[in-house]
Amino acid sequence: MIAATQLPVNGFLSTGAPFVADVNLIVQLAMGGALVAGVILARKKRYRAHGACQTTVLLLNLWMIGFEMWPSFGLQIAPHLPRVFHTAYYTIAAVHAALGTAAELLGIYIVLVAATKTKLLPPSLRFTQWKRWMRIELALWLLSLMCGIGTYYEWYVAPFR
């Protein structure tokens, strides 16, 4: 594994963003595409492939949250809450964090419910309306992705225009 001190400081998208922010943006966009591919798999009733696709995205995103997004939020946003909602720099990032947290937690819950064949959750905590919950999850994820793109823009593109 590459140590963080060995990563380039400057990004590769020519926006003024650090390298890890550029990598995160590209990975998030790819995961958004993978989520849409997962929806297509579900519509084709290829549920095993759908589950593998969506779970992989969920776990990769959990890693990206821990590696890039949570530390950035903790350093740049959390110390200034709640008194900074008058600027897009903070507001978009805070909304992104809230939507992203909701999407990630719901995704983990969906995976746990899907795994109830092994009795991870008692019947009272399971749901049966899969389409509803999957659509809510997809909507949360896509809204979070859009806010994440907005955060990237506000942090790394807009200041240099």
Task: Label the model's feature ranges.
Residues 1-161:
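Alpha-helical membrane insertion/targeting regions
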